[in-house]
Amino acid sequence: MRTRFLFLTSGCKAVPELHKIVLANAAPVKNPEIRYASTENRNYYITTPIFYVNASPHLGHLYSAVIADCFHRHKQLQGFNSRFATGTDEHGLKIQQAAEAAGKEPLEFCTTVSERFRHLFSSCNISNTDYIRTTEQRHHRAVQHFWSVLCSKGLIYKGSYEGWYSTQDESFLTPSQVTTALDSTGKEIKVSLESGHKVEWMKEENYMFRLSGFRSQLLDWLRENPRAIQPERFHHSVLQWLQEELPDLSVSRQKSRLQWGIPVPEDDGQTIYVWLDALVNYLTVVGYPNNHERWWNVAHHIIGKDILKFHAIYWPSFLLGAGLPLPQTIHVHSHWTVAGKKMSKSLGNVIDPQERSQLFTTDGLRYFLLRQGVPDTDCDYRDDKVVKLLNAELADALGGLLNRCTATALNPAQVYASFCPDSFPRERGGRADDDDYRMLESVRHLPAVVEQHFEDMHVYKALEAVSTCVRQTNGFVQRHAPWKLDRKDSADQRWLGTIIHVSLECLRIYGTLLQPVVPEISNKLLSRLGVQPHERSWTNLNFLPRFEGKDCPFEGRALGSDSGVLFSRLESQRADQQKNRKMEKGSNLK
């Protein structure tokens, strides 16, 4: 018979499977009503996970932040009042031990690493509206209030815990989640099946949360809300986990083991479990326990797949217990690997996001992560992939199109050229061909396509759709070769203006839609077109009004003065190395 977690009321002897008997005698958990978030207002609240400060930020941390930032900017583009929180998780045994190893006080250690995250996000144009640290007093107050609410509802009781615990993961594990492995000396040790981190057998008296009473409510929530957890495969994973009974959860540690954390109210001998502490940050940011409803009703979480259980089982259960609405969506993303392997210090394959953002530009790295990152599956990172993608799509396709249509050779007047309905009539005819009409249809529907992909958390598909339209527009210009037209011929002159006008309209749509992804490049593109800041919202995505017989506010307007390159081509690492070797040889000859 398999031994389970032991969750026993104070004074009971630890016996396998006895927790069922104990719970039968304990006060029953009332089934709280599931409260769903409002979808009626124009507020939007998105969060990243708060990042653990045991080490410096890596590419995966930036990926989470870029995704959240992209959704935040997208909602702002659509006129939503958006709030975006990120920050650092600074309590727990792992931090306590890391600070001791570094010879620093825990708060000093946390502040140093937290500032690295803050600096990275600032330098990569992460536009968070709040940066939360779990060592702040506002969070301390929120966590203790949340704990007290759960206690008042009879959901926390004091008992004994005996089982496996991973300090690295700050996680309790069942026997089925543990396996045997060999350490570096060949000694047998127990490790987590999921993370591979070492686990230890722990036995202590602490506080338990009645997680076992929430399984049916969680199942109801997920079945009634099939888009609550996205992508779909992760929704199914959680449903699969819920096919088994949920054991109660230890939510505190003895202070003798863990000093670095928030004390349990009215029991200074216990410290609140780091995951309960950390998850409450999402409430702290919006003012919990006072005036939080306005924002908490529209909450969305961005998380990595490794912390799905904490966010999809523990967190909703805590919220249900506290009588609070559940988040509207939990967006889950997979991980970045290098040569198919997980990044780790021991393998020496950790990608420094700060270094790469300087190498490929901030917008370049953001574009690559969102264009290549697929939420459902792990993605492999290589520098040459970054160079190839950015050169093809940002430098050549988008940058080349802008350069062609705004160059003095084709547009000597430097204006938003005029559209001629006779050259490109609504009914097929004039000098436009079938491919041109198909291109117009693609660009006209592009905002709706992009919006749907954002709703599905498929930003990479939205960018693929934009890239396809950019290629179509380049094909349109290439087919009609406006540089070959005779400007002395009035018909050719009108057709030239029409080609440029249509191309600039396409670029305006692309620049507007790309603002959440590459804000600096989009700003440069739209400024070059003469599009003012107040003309860059979702409501301005009325494509080619002259084609519909309406006025175009941009027609005849002077273009912006910045005629610089939109995105400079990147040289491959191999080319850079060859260039450096030549320079070194040259300097040696002198």
Curated annotation (Swiss-Prot):
A GO term, aspect molecular function: methionine-tRNA ligase activity
Originating gene: mars2
Residue ranges, annotated region (Disordered): 570-590
Name this protein carries in UniProt: Methionine--tRNA ligase, mitochondrial
Top EC class, one word: ligase
Motif 'KMSKS' region per record, residues: 342-346
Family, per entry: Belongs to the class-I aminoacyl-tRNA synthetase family.
Pfam families referenced in this protein's UniProt entry, alphabetically: Anticodon_3 (PF19303), tRNA-synt_1g (PF09334)
GO cellular component, one term: mitochondrial matrix
Binding positions for ATP per the UniProt entry: 345
Residue span of the annotated presequence: 1-26
PANTHER family associated with the record: METHIONINE--TRNA LIGASE, MITOCHONDRIAL, METHIONYL-TRNA SYNTHETASE
Coiled-coil annotated spans: none
